[in-house]
Amino acid sequence: MPVNFVAARKKRDGVNTHIELQKAIYKSRSFTEINNILDGILPDAHRETPFATYFEANLGCRRPDCMIVFDDLPKQIITCVLVEFKTTSRTAFDKRKKDAVQQYQLHQGEEQVRDAVKILSSITGRGCNLRVWGFLLFYQQSTLRVLHKTIPECAVTLTDRWAFSALLKKSKNESFHAFLQKSCTASTTGPQKELFGIHKPENSEVETVGATKSTRKGAEKSRLSRRSRKSN
């Protein structure tokens, strides 16, 4: 059911809180800072793993508020933590399920998370393990304290690294990232680097082999040249 009885001002407050959270994550420069904002949902095993953040990614029917993608290249594991934010002006989450607005937000958020996880998990292939976690976090609007969060199961599948990289590149919301870059404070050193598409071990191996062949050819030409000079 649509929550038409929610005042326009409260809707604006919710949108503003979303943006405030996204800015805070964008400006954060470490795993710990981001994990504190997200109430500790990030896997501790990836504390030292390179990662990239995506906001309002266009996944077709869904646009997750935030995605954090960890790329463990040596182990060939991609871990995607997908987060949907819901906000409330109330000081507590109604566990008795009598708050109609919160219950609507809860069901809507669960559908959004479920659909987004399904879309990301659909990029199958070989060569890389893909783990997708989908979280729904309820924040109190004035304190940004997490009042409630869902604890999902992890969707695990095999994927093709470059196909998944192409999905991330295609779905990145460039205009929203540009908005974050312009609106964040001058203390921000810049957006986090996009990790996918940079690591290409297969290509680098081919290039190395090619370079070796070129070196060998050059050496052979040099030896032939010396032989010619000696015969002359």
Swiss-Prot record:
Protein location: Virion; Host cytoplasm; Host nucleus, Host nucleolus; Host Golgi apparatus
Methyltransferase listed as a keyword: no
Keyword Transport among record annotations: no
Gene Ontology CC: one annotated term: virion component
InterPro entries found in the cross-reference section: Herpes_UL24 (IPR002580)
Regulation: induction: Expressed late in the infection cycle.
UniProt region (Disordered), positions on chain: 191-232
Keywords noted in UniProt: Host cytoplasm, Host Golgi apparatus, Host nucleus, Late protein, Virion
UniProt-listed Pfam families: Herpes_UL24
Taxonomic superkingdom: Viruses
Family membership: Belongs to the herpesviridae UL24 family.
Known role: May participate in nuclear egress of viral particles. Plays a role in the dispersal of several host nucleolar proteins including NCL/nucleolin and NPM1. Since deletion of host NCL/nucleolin negatively impact on nuclear egress, UL24 supposedly acts on this process through its effect on host nucleoli.
Protein's name in the database: Protein UL24 homolog
Species this protein is from: Elephantid herpesvirus 1 (isolate Asian elephant/Berlin/Kiba/1998)
